[in-house]
Amino acid sequence: LQQQPAKRKADITDCQSIIENHKGQRHRQQEVIESKQTAYFELIAQSTLNKHQQHHYYDVGSQVNVSFGVVRVANIMPCVDLTQYLLKRDWPENTEVRVMAYHSQQVLLLRSLQERHLDKVLKRKEKPGEIPGALNVPVIRQHLTTIKNLSPKIENVLFILVATPVEEVGRDHDFDWAVIEPSSYRSIIQLAGRVKRHRQGEVSEPNITLLQYNWKGIRDHH
């Protein structure tokens, strides 16, 4: 193992400031919970930008930097709330995001269509330096073309999947990077296995971010 190139490296996103900023407040008050959640979601958003900057590739057709990442959250409601937050957030002027929620309580037909789409986009087996096959998927190509036509200043496009543990089992997906809300060692290992799952080549910068605390730990801390 020591002779194998490191395909995955991880860093930790510090969440202590959220606890410090809400110390002494009534942690069960709805406005305090919402304030904590907004701060937590903002840390996640910043982490996605950091990982994109380190692990994107250049699409010649649209002339933008593209990456496909996953944010793993423990529960369905935070998954939905985070997806809405990322969609509404003010991103840098040169950055555009496409965000999709993926969890077990979606309508079965929708989930089936969604999984077929994800399987098509995320079966990444290109070699280092090769153009990702995902860029030839019509839906992805259409997104990139539309973004560039409507906003010529855009230089970065992040495709973000916000997923519950349903992503950890039975899916043969390959992401460029991941942001993980921790639950257990097993869940971390399972999700980390979806980063550069099939592609070879060592990474120099961390392509996985672990959040220091999970949402429940921050929400209930007082």
Question: Where are the regions that the model predicts?
Answer:
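A conserved SF2-helicase RecA2
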Residues: 200-203, 209-222
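Post-DEXD/H (motif II) to motif III coupling segment of the RecA-like Helicase ATP-binding lobe
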Residues: 1-2
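Short glycine-/polar-rich loops that comprise or flank the Walker A/P-loop
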Residues: 95-97, 174-176, 203-207
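Switch/connector loops and helix/strand junctions flanking conserved nucleotide-binding motifs
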Residues: 79-81, 108-113, 169-172, 187-190, ...
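Conserved SF2 helicase motif VI
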Residues: 185-208
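Short secondary-structure boundary/capping segments
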Residues: 85-90, 176-178, 194-195, 222
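A short beta-strand element within the Helicase C-terminal
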Residues: 171-184
